[in-house]
Amino acid sequence: MKSKWNEETAEILIQQYENQGISKDLALRVYSCRLLGHDPSLVLHGGGNVSLKTSASDGLKGDQQVICVKGSGWDMGDIEPPGLPSMYLDQLLKLQSLTSLVDEDMVTYQRRSLLHPSSPNPSIETLLHAFLPHTYIDHTHAFLPHTYIDHTHAT
């Protein structure tokens, strides 16, 4: 697989978003998400998820550890910063000790964890991204594995 990353394009995006108050981390996450989303061998119908663990200011408590996860309904190839809503990471990590959680409660809790209440709904897979220790997570719905999985003779 050949990398499509371009430092010049990344720097232009960093500068463009910096003027809007968007951090370098988030600008680069937007860029990498778009690269994945534009590769039809990696992403079907704009689907998949990306996340970033970083810090962000909520305006009250100063910098907080957050996770930015692709919002539901956003196309990876056309993502903009609002499509990666920020949530308080410590709030989400509290859910790791639960033995069960119904979907409706999970969605409600994720919404309560948003830095900005008007943000879009984060992905239903947000907790998976939060519980994994990695700063950056890319999860795509690649075409080739699906062709094998969906084959009538797949076992």
Segments predicted by a language model, with ranges:
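N-terminal low-complexity or amphipathic/hydrophobic leaders
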Residues: 20-109, 122, 127, 131
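A glycine- and small-aliphatic-rich helix-loop capping segment at beta-alpha/alpha-beta transitions
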Residues: 85-86, 150-155
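Flexible, glycine/proline-enriched loop segments at strand-loop-helix junctions
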Residues: 111-119
